[in-house]
From Swiss-Prot:
Pathway field: Cofactor biosynthesis; 7,8-dihydroneopterin triphosphate biosynthesis; 7,8-dihydroneopterin triphosphate from GTP: step 1/1
Single Gene Ontology BP annotation: tetrahydrofolate biosynthetic process
The protein, known as: GTP cyclohydrolase FolE2
Pfam families: GCHY-1 (PF02649)
Function, in words: Converts GTP to 7,8-dihydroneopterin triphosphate.
Name of encoding gene: folE2
Site (May be catalytically important): C154
Keywords from the UniProt entry: Hydrolase
InterPro entries linked to this entry: GTP_cyclohydrolase_FolE2, GTP_cyclohydrolase_FolE2/MptA
NCBIfam families: PRK13674.1-1 (NF010200)
Organism in which the protein naturally occurs: Xanthomonas oryzae pv. oryzae (strain KACC10331 / KXO85)
Major enzyme class: hydrolase
Length: 306
């Protein structure tokens, strides 16, 4: 049947000829399976392309890319499977002289996270994940990117707030040489919020190169490393004891955007040879955001964009 249908990509002449670096599709809706027991899989968005070196050809075969993507992603996703998929994409376009292929998969990984203090209480967190793979000249590179939300409290604002509180205490008790401990505690209970530092939800985007011999993506492990370094990840289900514990964590981990970037750099350098970090504080004091970027000394890939 298809033999009788017109194919203008083959039959129609065209006047513009040039090789193309990448041609393909993006934002394809497709499920991915992180393990064999994941059932219907995670809802993902895929982008897939090959190069088109033959300048005289009008275009590539989009349907071949789609069918191969669909076929391979019916299997559990793994670092070992991605080179096979990329090579299949290249081979499917031998008539186009394609030598390179690339793929990105984006999805949200749902993780149940325990509350800080309340026993038996937990809630769901959605972590944006992006896996990018590229094959060129027989060499495959794989990158894993995760996004982590955390709270940041400004050290400068905290110092200014402490000064205001101290000044208020001195002003109200200038007449007294000594105060009972209970009176001091009661004053702090009544006036401890005389001034409060500004804090805000913040986002860290971390991208790492995965070694060629890696056995798994270890997505949860990477998320755990980031949250451990930052110490103030946003919470899901909370009761008052959990909220109080979160306030304590923020007080013990005051940080500028520079501090957050350096914390992540130190943590990741102990586990990955090549990585990139981009952090953004959605300032509650300002109408703009504060940002910082860093990476490994041998960082070779383009920085992530928040």
């Amino acid at each position: 049947m298809s033999a009788t249908l017109p194919d203008v990509a083959v039959t129609e002449a065209f006047t513009l000829s040039a090789p193309l670096r990448w041609v393909g599709m993006q934002d394809i809706a497709i499920p991915v399976h992180l393990d064999a027991a994941s059932g219907s899989g995670l809802a993902a968005r895929a982008s897939v392309q090959v190069d088109l070196p033959r300048a005289e050809l009008k275009g590539i075969h989009m349907s071949r890319l789609y069918r191969l993507l669909d076929l391979h992603l019916q299997r559990p996703l793994s670092p070992a499977m991605l080179p096979q998929l990329l090579q299949a994409l290249i081979e499917s376009h031998a008539d186009c002289a394609s030598r390179a292929a690339r793929l990105t998969l984006s999805f949200a990984l749902m993780l149940r996270m325990p509350a800080l203090r309340s026993e038996g209480l937990s809630g769901w967190r959605a972590y944006p994940v992006r896996i990018a793979a590229q094959c060129r000249a027989g060499r495959t590179t794989i990158q894993l990117q995760v996004e982590v939300l955390y709270a940041s409290t400004c050290p400068c604002s905290a110092a200014l707030s402490r000064q205001l509180l101290s000044d208020a205490f001195v002003q109200q008790h200038a007449w007294c040489d000594a105060l009972p401990l209970q009176d001091v505690a009661q004053w702090l209970q009544d006036h401890g919020s005389y001034a409060t530092p500004h804090s805000q939800r913040s986002v860290a985007q971390v991208c790492v190169d995965l070694p060629a011999d890696t056995q798994g993506f270890a997505i949860q492990e990477l998320i755990g490393l980031c949250e451990q370094a930052l110490a103030t990840p946003v919470q899901a289900a909370v009761r008052r004891p959990d909220e109080q514990a979160f306030a304590r964590l923020n007080g013990a981990n005051l940080m500028y955007v520079e501090d957050a970037a350096r914390r992540l750099r130190k943590q990741l350098a102990e586990h990955y040879a090549t990585f990139h970090v981009a952090v953004r504080h959605l300032e509650s004091l300002h109408a703009h955001d504060a940002v910082a970027e860093t990476g490994s000394d041998d960082e070779t890939f383009f920085p992530a964009a928040l």
